[in-house]
Regions:
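Short, surface-exposed, charged amphipathic helix/loop patches that serve as local interaction elements
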Residues: 17-20, 24-121
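Short acidic, Pro/Gly- and aromatic-enriched capping/linker segments at domain boundaries
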Residues: 1-12
Length: 121
C-alpha cells in the first residue's frame, strides 16, 4: 500500500491554480493542536462577549487561527505568481488573493475532519 502524506487540490476560487496540503496524521494533529490551543480558547471567550470590541477581537483571533491552519497545512501552490514571484504559503497569506486563502483553509479543515461548526471557529 502506498500512502501519500499530501493531497493536491484544484482551487475552486481560482480555476487553474492547484495547491498541495498536508494530510492529517497523529503527529501533525498534535502539532496543530498545540499551535491553536491558546488562540482557540481566547476566541471562545471573546465570542461570548456582547460588545462590539469583543466581537471584533474574536474575528481577529479567528483570522489568526485560519492563518495558523494555512501556514501549517499548505505545502505548495502551482499556477500562481504574486507580483512576479512564485506563490508560497507566506506570500499567499501576506499578499495573495483572499479567496484562495479561504479555499485552502477550508480544504485543510476538511482534511482535519472538522465539521462546518468546528471549521467556523
Amino acid at each position: 500500500m502506498e500512502y501519500a502524506s499530501e493531497k493536491r487540490i484544484e482551487s475552486k476560487a481560482l480555476p487553474g491554480v492547484w495547491f498541495t496540503i498536508a494530510r492529517m496524521s497523529f503527529g501533525r494533529r498534535i502539532e496543530l493542536t498545540r499551535r491553536i490551543w491558546e488562540l482557540a480558547g481566547k476566541a471562545e471567550y471573546l465570542e461570548a462577549g456582547a460588545d462590539v470590541r469583543g466581537r471584533l477581537e474574536a474575528a481577529l483571533v479567528a483570522a489568526e487561527i485560519d492563518s495558523v491552519y494555512l501556514r501549517w497545512g499548505l505545502r505548495k501552490i502551482e499556477g500562481l505568481t504574486v507580483d512576479g514571484e512564485q506563490a508560497t504559503a507566506e506570500l499567499v497569506v501576506t499578499q495573495g488573493p483572499e479567496a484562495l486563502c479561504r479555499d485552502v483553509v477550508a480544504a485543510i479543515k476538511a482534511e482535519c475532519g472538522l465539521n462546518a461548526a468546528e471549521a467556523k471557529n
